[in-house]
Amino acid sequence: MQVSVETTEGLGRRMTVQVPAERVENEVERRLKDLSGRVKMDGFRPGKVPVKVVRKQYGAQVRSEVLSEVVQQTYSEALEQESLRPAGNPHIEPKRTGEGEDLEYEASFDVLPEIEVAGLDQIQVERPQVEITDADLDNVLERLRKQHADYQEVDRAAQDEDRVVIDFHGTIDGEAFTGNSAEDAPLILGAGQLPEAFEQGLQGAKAGQELTVEHKFPDELAEPSIAGKTAVFQVTVKRVEEPQLPELDDDFAARLGIQEGGVEALREAVRGNLERERHQAVRQRLKRQVLDQLADQNELELPKSLIDGEIQALRQQSGASAEGELPESERSAYEDVASRRVKLGLLVNELVRSQGIQLDRERMMTQLREMAANSGQDPSEALQQIAQDRQMMQSLEASVIEEQVVDWLLEQVQTEDKTLSFDELMNSEDGDQASA
């Protein structure tokens, strides 16, 4: 087998592979002979069909199968021979496949960059120290009362905490867009649910009033067809309703599923939830800090094929069609996020390799059981379904390995305690989920 490799652009490689004809022809003949002993054809006894008859009937199919398998086998062999590490799947272009001649094909692909993780001694991480206070509990209980409020229609101008029921219809440059209209939409003023333009327009509005609201969508919106564009909404106010909050008593606790212990048991349940939220938020804040700084400390040339694949995944997650060529103007909306994910993925994988980090099976099983318990199904059935879902299991393995890498990184870098309130922790951008 002869192999030659040329660099196309950046990390791109074009590998030409020539395979001796004997490797293909010998395998074709072997399979045809094997088939002649098994195939049933009219006019011949079982196992006595001549090879030339089998070749005439099945030769093209057998040859196609052999060519496909030989290409797969020799592609892997050629990569090993040339010490190449491809990033993603290759594009295979056959050059010669004729009977009796050497097989020749070209494989085009990106290779992984050479990576030596550096700068760990320059990473400084703030480790949040957060105490759950009685005031935090009171804030949550007040939010629960508001969430379970009854609303009563009132004949006055709308104000904060009122529920305003509206019909709206929006257009961009006179054209409708996905999600542009709704009827009887209930909106709570002052709850942070609404764009600022809607808040300003609805404050002080009364039932029966019609108004026009303009809203500019964020440039970084995941849906590129409306990102950065201004929509004009025609709004009709149908009702203004004020909240009637329930009393914080044992009956209210029972409404929330606390059958014994009343308000005190409810407070303990809320505290437990806040403790879990605190743990998760602290972890995500640490993870975001260490991964962001890891990326900043290491400059990498990124394989274009991996970025393209990540962009396609982001488009699918946003509900956009992932088919067809992506215009450059829309590509830029995804490219920064996609590049960050690819970069962190490469760095994490290199740390897994260089530090010999092995999948923690016990940690993975714990996460599996938590997923099953939170699925809303019978936990044992849910566990079995998840375990049989290969894609989900691969995603879970990658997530657990990534968490193990974060653990290792946090042991290497400099950390400093920082006291925060619970609200400061939960409202910080650093508390958002980070992922490679």
UniProtKB/Swiss-Prot annotation:
GO molecular function, one term: ribosome binding
Signal peptide residue numbers: none
Domain PPIase FKBP-type positions: 161-246
Chain segments carrying region Disordered: 1-26, 81-100
GO cellular component, one term: cytoplasm
Main location: cytoplasm
GO biological process, one term: cell division
Catalytic activities: [protein]-peptidylproline (omega=180) = [protein]-peptidylproline (omega=0)
Keyword Nucleotidyltransferase included in the entry's annotation: no
EC number: 5.2.1.8
Subcellular location: Cytoplasm
Entry keyword set: Cell cycle, Cell division, Chaperone, Cytoplasm, Isomerase, Rotamase
Family to which this protein belongs: Belongs to the FKBP-type PPIase family. Tig subfamily.
Domain notes: Consists of 3 domains; the N-terminus binds the ribosome, the middle domain has PPIase activity, while the C-terminus has intrinsic chaperone activity on its own.
Known function: Involved in protein export. Acts as a chaperone by maintaining the newly synthesized protein in an open conformation. Functions as a peptidyl-prolyl cis-trans isomerase.
Name of the protein described by the UniProt record: Trigger factor
Species of origin: Halorhodospira halophila (strain DSM 244 / SL1)
Taxonomic path: Bacteria, Pseudomonadati, Pseudomonadota, Gammaproteobacteria, Chromatiales
